[in-house]
Amino acid sequence: MEALVYTFLLVTTLGILFFSIIFRDPPRINQ
């Protein structure tokens, strides 16, 4: 169970960083 918790925390951390980069620097497709 500990491995599952650690993988969950790792995925959530990477997801937060990924979305923060996207929302900070949005793609310029519309522009």
Curated annotation (Swiss-Prot):
The chain crosses the membrane at residues 3-23. It comes from the Eukaryota. It is found in: Plastid, Cyanelle thylakoid membrane. Pfam families: PsbT (PF01405). Its main location: plastid. SUPFAM superfamilies: Photosystem II reaction center protein T, PsbT. Signal peptide: none annotated. Keywords: Cyanelle, Membrane, Photosynthesis, Photosystem II, Plastid, Thylakoid, Transmembrane, Transmembrane helix. Belongs to the PsbT family. This is Photosystem II reaction center protein T. The gene is psbT.
